[in-house]
């Protein structure tokens, strides 16, 4: 019964009001909450794209070992992304406060987007059935997406 409930929940969350993005398609514009320079801010995709390509990397949870390492890797390569005129944004379901703490502690030079309502997670189809210590749950699949300056999804890494 528990597996059936999880499967049903997965089908419901996997059926967003809009189709998940695929490489070669134009990304839907969105505005959402984010943390920049230690303060709550907003992020708008079309506005960001005026400055060049955008990398959105989705990660499960702030301040966990794997997510910290991933964020540190993006931080350490930040100058290379800047040289390529590409902006980096991390996305998780964590709160703005959790993002503020995580960003400050790790000295991330990029914004962290709070997707507590899973709007972006559904758009990019990153909510997946996962297992941890034998328990099944719905969580974010670690994924990265490159959107060119025209708003077209060029590449995805999962």
Region locations from a protein language model:
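Positively charged n-region of N-terminal signal peptides that target proteins for export
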Residues: 1-4
């Amino acid at each position: 019964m528990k597996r059936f409930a999880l499967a049903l929940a997965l089908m419901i969350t996997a059926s967003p009001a809009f189709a998940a993005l695929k490489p070669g398609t134009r990304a839907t514009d969105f505005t959402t909450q984010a943390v920049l320079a230690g303060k709550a801010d907003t992020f708008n995709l079309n506005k960001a794209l005026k400055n060049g390509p955008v990398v959105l990397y989705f990660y499960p949870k702030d301040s966990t070992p794997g997510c910290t390492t991933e964020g540190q890797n993006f931080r350490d390569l930040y100058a290379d992304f800047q040289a390529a005129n590409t902006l980096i944004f991390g996305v998780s379901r964590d709160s703005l406060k959790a993002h503020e703490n995580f960003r400050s502690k790790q000295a991330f030079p990029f914004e962290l987007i709070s997707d507590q309502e899973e709007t972006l997670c559904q758009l990019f189809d990153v909510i997946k059935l996962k297992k941890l210590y034998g328990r099944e749950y719905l969580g974010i699949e670690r994924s990265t997406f490159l959107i060119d300056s025209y708003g077209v999804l060029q590449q995805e890494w999962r």
